[in-house]
Amino acid sequence: MQVETLELQSEKNRKRLVEIVYKAKAGHIGGDLSCLNVLTALYFDIMRVWPDKPKETKRDRFVMSKGHCVEALYVTLEAKGFISREVTDTLGEFGSILSGHPTIEVPGIEVNTGALGHGLSVGVGMAMAAKMDKADYKTYVLMGDGEQGEGSIYEAAMAGNQYKLDNLVAIIDRNRLQISGTTEEVMSLESMRDRWTAFGWDVLEMNGDEMEDIIRTFRSIDYTNKKPHLLISHTTKGKGVSYMEGIAKWHHGVPTAEQYEEAVREVSERIEKLEKENNGK
């Protein structure tokens, strides 16, 4: 898929995200917005997935380790065709299959997540299974940067290197903010690239706010180098909604009616601009 088409899809997903968080009156909207470009790139360009066959054995696997940002995953699954708009609209309602963290009740979700630090271990297991079965699917794991304070991640990192899991790609959403402030104030992560390189991983960095760089980086991965891959995705918390960008309090939050209208207006203007540009080509 062309970069311009992916950019448009990401903005449509962004608008839908704002809608469902506002309707549900709950959501980790800041981190949702920072990882939305990566999710769009994965589901609409990089991964092999089939909405009509969500359990197809050849499918690539995705693990949302930063499970509190599940709203971004829901709107991506809706846009891809795994779940309907009617289902997504039930977020926050009693009896809905959509909860505040991913669960396998939802088509397209591989594993229950939300307890931070566990997703990479699951991803390592999935990648090992593919190697043992001589299957060619890839496993992708999206982690938060605040999540890097969890020690279990580094046990999984050692295992990924030990078993030469070059079919495993971990992505860190490096937005530099968590619920209590900046990541550097809470637990410094400036050595991130060096530490993962020391663990034997193939480390790449990308601008997660720019779709072109995301696609270029994913496509540059060497899946034959006998090393697991780590992508450090430099992003902006609250990306795409001006009054949320770079503000820690939007780790979890719901816009007021006025703020909601402002967010929808901002995103809608970008959608209209991108549609005109795409139609003009």
Swiss-Prot record:
Protein keywords: Carbohydrate metabolism, Thiamine pyrophosphate, Transferase
Recorded superkingdom: Bacteria
CDD domains assigned to the protein according to its UniProt record, in alphabetical order: TPP_TK (cd02012)
Pathway where this protein functions: Carbohydrate metabolism
Enzyme Commission code(s) on record: 2.2.1.13
Subunit architecture: Probable heterodimer composed of AptA and AptB.
Entry function: Involved in catabolism of D-apiose. Catalyzes the transfer of the glycolaldehyde group from apulose-4-phosphate to D-glyceraldehyde 3-phosphate, generating dihydroxyacetone phosphate and D-xylulose-5-phosphate.
Designated name of the protein: Apulose-4-phosphate transketolase subunit A
Organism ancestry: Bacteria, Pseudomonadati, Bacteroidota, Bacteroidia, Bacteroidales
Protein encoded by which gene: aptA
